[in-house]
């Protein structure tokens, strides 16, 4: 026992009571209910921070408090002391740590509850006191005003207005509502003086006051009310900012009164929004002028959306314009322009062809142009040594060296002369690319070298080549080949050229004729000099610094390389990696290969190259243009593909030759191009001479080519390029030509009698002439009465005086023998029934289309317009 007491004495001193070391909360929290207008309130959490100090008393640490501020705090202190005493007593009984923590928590909950109850009680007391004070102040103010008014009324009947004014003046000073005790001593002072006066008034004259309540007294009473309203206490100036933000403190919560700013109610917010909406509606919305983009065809709904109007309004506008359309119906750009103008917007017309705008670039100035090599096409009969001449010219290329047997990789190549000048040659067997390029109006070839054998002279295919060159509008240089043969007669060739309007320099013309021998390599230098001289006369120049443009000479699909196009660059410089468009195809340049099979990085003007990287295979003769990015290339290629599909669809729908020449009827063309193929030369000459005599100053037949033999692919290509007619006299087309004609839409006519040819051609030429319009008189009608019909307009009641009046005919309105209107007859009725015509002596009702200025006594002249076909 003594040992245990010794151990208790030796126990070290602790800063807290025995048990687990804990920290009590130094921040007490509570909740305060904050009130708003319309009976709304919300609970706000507040915090109170305390500074706690402890001292040692009786071997344990106790908290030192500043003092008990209220009875509740004293009770709490006593309760805390009891709990601490109980805890010390319980420590002797070995309480567990969990029990100690539970008791401590229960104590804290009790303290917090007491604090909340006290805070709510104080808040309620303060609020009730403020309400009672405000009510008492309002009652005192009302009583004071009533006494002053009574005193003023009593003083008015007396002849002392001077005394009444000082009595009312003490009311003028305003006092704050918060100063409630101030009016108490002032209340008996104000009416102290008027009381004897009010009592003396009935003593002197009892009926004076009732008689005094006249109109003047009522007016004075109104003025007193206005003065009282003017002297109302001024509102308390708000010292706090509106829409207070931040944390609510205990002081603000306990001292809350009516002066504090309250939040806006939901009803006030709704009223403000309604006022703004009404103000916006009353002000009226200003019309917004928009820029409406209108394509070639647009639906009514889409047009309404772009103008930001209702579709029904657009339909009404179309009805006023005489167009009946539904919401989903397409209208043309002209009608859409009228609608947009009617609504007051600005219109911008666009077309699908706008994607091609700016594709060719701007025109080059003379400062940026440099001389470029000429592009030469070698043409002629296959047996006249054209291939041998090409091989001989290629062998003179100083770049290729002495080997000479260089394989030609592409259909075009470039030769460098000994002088350093370059010439680009294009090999066009069959002339497919040449005619296709002419059809697109592309002037690819600068000079044509016409090869004619000195021993054979002019052959049918030579004549065909001459016509191709003339159609392209390029100068011709005649190369008279095979002069080394014994039977060569160059002079005969020059004489035969005169029949085809080619006059050589030896005969006084301007056509250069060079006598050469491809086999013996004679006068090749003279031919090259003649080409360079002609190029110098043409002054061929190009800008090498701009975006590349050119033409596709030929295109093919190769295994392992994909689509490969042979391109002749005309302007600019083509580089690897550039994006380009070739006809309806596009791609990116993956590689450039020259005519010697070498890969190059770029190609300048008049340079033929192979281009790899196409997405598809273009057609020979398509234009080749580089663009800025792939998006533009896809857009252009897509547009051209659609145009090609539409053109093919139109060709498939075309059934007669008259439909093919519908454009000619509208005045777009005045010539009928024809290609003639026959069995014998005599028949061809007869047909040609007959067709050339046809026509007049307005229309005529243009013979593109006339030869003996079957119809082949070259004839189809020539007819397609010129959009002409192909005539076969006692001959037929081979299978390849038929397939090509079916694909390209070329019309082939077969004949066996020459008179049938002349009759059909005469009808075609007559169809090209515009028909003659002739007026046919129908009758007269006199207007006897004018009726105004609802939803119809003015209707003329007429009597037919001469001839017949037909529905749908043309009419003239005559007034005093002067024509004042010419238009169409809209309606023709007899006894409310629509009739086709009305004869002389009958009455009828007539209305005019889009015209209502009709009067009694006017005369209506009815007539028809007849189209008379013009014949040759």
Swiss-Prot record:
Gene Ontology CC, one term: cytosol
Domain tr-type G: 371-539
InterPro entries in UniProt: EF-G-like_DII (IPR053905), EFTu-like_2 (IPR004161), IF2_assoc_dom_bac (IPR013575), IF2_II (IPR044145), IF2_N (IPR006847), P-loop_NTPase (IPR027417), Small_GTP-bd (IPR005225), T_Tr_GTP-bd_dom (IPR000795)
PANTHER family: TR-TYPE G DOMAIN-CONTAINING PROTEIN, TRANSLATION INITIATION FACTOR IF-2-RELATED
Chain segments carrying region G3: 427-430
Keyword hit for Secreted: no
Subcellular location(s) of the protein: Cytoplasm
Signal peptide positions on this chain: none
An MF annotation (GO) of this entry: guanosine tetraphosphate binding
Function: One of the essential components for the initiation of protein synthesis. Protects formylmethionyl-tRNA from spontaneous hydrolysis and promotes its binding to the 30S ribosomal subunits. Also involved in the hydrolysis of GTP during the formation of the 70S ribosomal complex.
Region of interest (G5), ranges: 517-519
Biased composition range(s): Pro residues: 182-194
Region annotated G4, chain positions: 481-484
Family to which the UniProt record says this protein belongs: Belongs to the TRAFAC class translation factor GTPase superfamily. Classic translation factor GTPase family. IF-2 subfamily.
UniProt protein name: Translation initiation factor IF-2
Span list, region G1: 380-387
Binding-site list for GTP: 380-387, 427-431, 481-484
Comp. bias regions, Basic and acidic residues: 130-155, 271-282
Biased composition (Low complexity): 156-181, 195-211
Annotated segments matching region Disordered: 130-282
Pfam families from the UniProt entry: EF-G_D2, GTP_EFTU, GTP_EFTU_D2, IF-2, IF2_assoc, IF2_N
Region G2, annotated ranges: 405-409
Keywords: Cytoplasm, GTP-binding, Initiation factor, Nucleotide-binding, Protein biosynthesis
CDD domains: IF2_eIF5B (cd01887), IF2_mtIF2_II (cd03702), mtIF2_IVc (cd03692)
